[in-house]
């Protein structure tokens, strides 16, 4: 399947954003929110978002994008606030940085993770970043 | 007119003509892109020159006007619409200045986001 693109008409010509570019912005926005963790052990957010169906799904409409996210929240963090924080961060970065109009941002909280497990995940992903 | 001949500008019946190859135009576009803050080549450390530039830069001529298509990466943190607009302006400006060919449009395709910590070379 050809790479999907969001095409915006500008005075000097088209500006097309690949779907993977929008996904990268959304994934990075989620990482900024405290209390959010990857859905499964052993992978960072990026790993999960590498396969769009799993954690992050962006649908391109004519002039805007709709976002669907599946996240896990660390126990102890207020789930609703974290989810709202994710919605806000994703919307802000896609609008402010990518410069696209954002329609819906749907967040599905699929799991809560005990803090000690989250800690393990965090160390693992930090090590992974240093090696990569 | 053979396509490989390049873009021709007629200076006048007695002065002859100037032909500029696609590679030259593609290279100019790549060099212009390299100077725009927030824009990076989608692969490698610099925009390719010469024949290699054709992979990233598509040049078309219609009714005496040039249409450019360029693939780029955007460095994370820079507002995409702002830097792509600067890129369009810069490429149009440079090509018109250096080749005297009018540029009709510069189509930009953002294929990648580069996160500063992943950027080859690091601090720049």
Regions flagged by a language model, labelled:
Chain B
Residues 1-80, 85, 101-107, 111-113, ...:
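Contiguous, often N-terminal, cationic amphipathic patches that form binding interfaces
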Residues 92:
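Glycine-rich active-site/cofactor-binding loop and its immediate structural neighborhood
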């Amino acid at each position: 399947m050809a790479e999907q693109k969001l095409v915006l008409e500008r005075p000097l010509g088209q500006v097309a954003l690949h779907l993977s570019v929008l996904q990268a912005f959304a994934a990075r926005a989620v990482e900024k929110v405290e209390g959010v963790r990857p859905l499964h052990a052993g992978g960072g957010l990026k790993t999960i978002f590498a396969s769009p169906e799993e954690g992050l799904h962006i649908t391109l409409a004519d002039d805007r994008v709709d976002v669907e996210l599946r996240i896990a929240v660390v126990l102890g963090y207020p789930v609703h606030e974290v989810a709202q924080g994710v919605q806000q961060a994703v919307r802000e970065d896609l609008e402010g940085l990518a410069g696209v109009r954002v329609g819906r941002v749907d967040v599905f909280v699929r799991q809560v993770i005990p803090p000690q497990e989250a800690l393990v995940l965090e160390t693992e992903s930090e090590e992974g970043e240093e090696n990569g | 007119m053979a396509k490989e001949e390049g873009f021709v500008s007629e200076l006048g019946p007695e002065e002859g003509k100037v032909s500029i190859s696609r590679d030259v135009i593609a290279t100019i576009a790549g060099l212009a892109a390299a100077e725009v803050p927030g824009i990076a080549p989608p692969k490698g450390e610099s925009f390719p020159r010469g024949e290699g530039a054709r992979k990233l830069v598509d040049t078309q001529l219609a009714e005496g006007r040039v249409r450019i298509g360029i693939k780029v990466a955007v460095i994370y943190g820079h507002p995409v619409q702002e830097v792509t607009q600067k890129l369009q302006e810069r490429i149009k400006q440079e090509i018109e200045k250096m080749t005297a060919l009018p540029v009709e449009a510069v189509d930009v395709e953002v294929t990648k986001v580069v996160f500063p910590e992943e950027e080859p070379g690091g601090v720049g």
